[in-house]
Amino acid sequence: ANIARLLKDLSGKKILYLCPSAGLVEQNAEKFALTGEPYSVYSASIGKSLRHDVVFATEGTFKKVSEENGYRFSCVILDEAHRITPTIKKIISDMRAKNPNLRVVGMTATPYRLGDGYIYEIDTQGRKMEEAKSPYFKKLVYAVGGRYLVERGYLTRPVIGRTGVAGYNTDKLKLNSNNS
């Protein structure tokens, strides 16, 4: 949310913050509300407004208006960027057709996908990521390590070893269609 505010302040233009779910739209909008800046929400289950310079939206709802309204935005921030979908790619394509200078910022805690590798081509040191298979993002701009987050209280320190539990009751667990 603070990144959205910073980008809006720097550009003076509209920022679209795309989330994969209404719950994440609400969560990010609530954090942004703490800045005191106005914002809009564009999500079928929450409300639909494009009025303010920062818009929090779900991809499924925003895709219906991306062609007509996408040109208004200078930047798209993708929450959970490791889950980039064909819908998101279409939204960005529609927006870039009318605004070739559109910037896309992806945010994720998990930049590596099993089977696909990294979601970016080049790391912060300028090294090409050989494990990246058709990454959507060109470059990783900033990374925060787990130790940094633990030291500042954002994450709890992991506990390794015995949990004090002799075992778990898995009698009521059901296998899915893949038997997992």
What are these regions (language model features)?
Residues 2, 7-34:
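Conserved Walker A/P-loop ATP-binding site and its immediately adjacent core
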Residues 19, 43, 108:
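Short beta-strand/turn micro-motifs composed of small residues
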Residues 22-24, 61-63, 82-83, 109-114, ...:
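Conserved nucleotide-binding/hydrolysis micro-motifs of P-loop NTPases
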Residues 25-28, 50, 64-65, 86, ...:
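Switch/connector loops and helix/strand junctions flanking conserved nucleotide-binding motifs
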Residues 32-68:
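Inter-Walker segment of RecA-like/P-loop motor cores
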Residues 59-61, 68-113:
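SF2 helicase catalytic motif II
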Residues 112-134:
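Short regulatory helix/loop adjacent to the ATP-binding pocket of P-loop NTPases
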Residues 135-180:
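Conserved interdomain linker/interface between the two RecA-like ATPase lobes of SF2 helicase motors
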